[in-house]
C-alpha cells in the first residue's frame, strides 16, 4: 500500500535523481522571484502560454535564499559581491558595490554634461550596463592547464567554460583593485576606475587577459597534449 501511494506521489515529492546535489526531480519548475508587469494572454507566445499552463499543474521549486523580487537585483553583481566578500562581511561588500555603481554614475553623468551635444548619445550612463560590458571585456577566451607528459609539465592551451571565464574576469578585477591601490585610495574608487577602463577595453585587467592569450599562442605547439 505504501509503495503504491509513493508511486502516485512520485512526481510531486523530492527524490533522488541524476542531477548532483538536487533535492527536486526534473518534474519541478524553476521559481520566478521577479514580479514583472502582467502581460495579457494575447501578447504571449505559444511557448509562454504552454509554460503558464504548466505552472498551474506542476510544483515549483523553493526560491533560493539570495533571490529577490527587487528591480535592482542583478545575478552577475550578486556573484561579484560574493567573490569580493572577505571574512563573511557581506554588508561591507554590498556597500562597496553600491558606492562603486554610484561613483560610475556620477562620473558618466559629469562626462555627459561636459561633452558636446553631438557626442552625448555615445556616452553610457547606466552603471549596470557598464559593469556587464566591463566583465564581458575582461573574460579570457582560452586558458592554460598544467599537464604532465614524460615526467615534464607543459602549459597547454585549453578552452574555458563560461563559468570559468566569468570567474577569472571577476578574480582579476578584485585582485587588481586590492593589490595595486595607490596611497589611501578607497576600494570603491579603485574599482570604479578599473571598471570604466575595462569598459573602454583598457586597463591592467585587459592587459592581463591579453598576456594570457599571448602565452596560449606561444604554447600552441603543446595543444595536442590536451587529449591526455
UniProtKB/Swiss-Prot annotation:
Domain of life: Eukaryota
Gene3D superfamilies per record: Ribosomal protein S7 domain
InterPro entries: Ribosomal_uS7, Ribosomal_uS7_dom, Ribosomal_uS7_dom_sf
GO biological process, one term: ribosomal small subunit assembly
UniProt-recorded Gene Ontology molecular function terms: mRNA binding; rRNA binding; structural constituent of ribosome
Disulfide bond entries: none
GO cellular component entries: mitochondrial small ribosomal subunit; ribosome
This protein's record includes keyword Zinc: no
Keyword Acetylation on entry: no
Transit peptide, from-to: 1-33
Record-linked PANTHER family: RIBOSOMAL PROTEIN S7
Family: Belongs to the universal ribosomal protein uS7 family.
Protein name (database record): Small ribosomal subunit protein uS7m
Gene encoding the protein: mrps7
Amino acid at each position: 500500500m505504501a509503495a503504491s501511494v509513493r508511486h502516485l506521489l512520485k512526481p510531486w515529492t523530492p527524490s533522488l535523481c541524476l542531477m548532483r546535489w538536487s533535492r527536486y526531480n526534473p518534474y519541478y519548475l524553476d521559481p520566478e522571484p521577479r514580479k514583472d508587469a502582467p502581460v495579457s494572454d494575447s501578447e504571449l507566445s505559444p511557448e509562454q502560454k504552454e509554460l503558464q499552463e504548466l505552472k498551474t499543474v506542476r510544483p515549483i521549486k523553493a526560491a533560493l535564499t539570495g533571490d529577490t523580487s527587487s528591480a535592482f537585483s542583478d545575478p552577475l553583481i550578486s556573484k561579484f559581491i560574493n567573490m569580493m566578500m572577505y571574512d563573511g562581511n557581506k554588508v561591507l561588500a554590498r556597500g562597496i558595490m553600491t558606492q562603486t555603481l554610484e561613483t560610475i554614475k556620477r562620473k558618466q553623468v559629469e562626462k555627459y554634461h561636459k561633452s558636446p551635444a553631438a557626442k552625448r548619445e555615445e556616452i553610457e550612463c547606466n552603471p549596470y550596463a557598464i559593469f556587464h560590458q566591463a566583465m564581458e571585456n575582461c573574460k579570457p577566451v582560452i586558458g592554460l592547464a598544467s599537464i604532465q607528459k614524460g615526467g615534464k609539465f607543459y602549459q597547454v592551451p585549453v578552452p574555458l567554460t563560461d563559468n570559468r571565464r566569468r570567474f577569472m574576469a571577476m578574480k582579476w578585477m578584485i585582485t587588481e583593485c586590492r593589490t595595486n591601490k595607490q596611497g589611501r585610495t578607497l576600494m570603491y574608487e579603485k574599482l570604479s576606475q578599473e571598471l570604466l577602463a575595462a569598459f573602454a577595453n583598457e586597463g591592467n585587467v585587459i592587459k592581463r587577459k591579453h598576456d594570457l592569450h599571448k602565452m596560449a599562442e606561444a604554447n600552441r605547439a603543446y595543444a595536442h597534449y590536451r587529449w591526455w
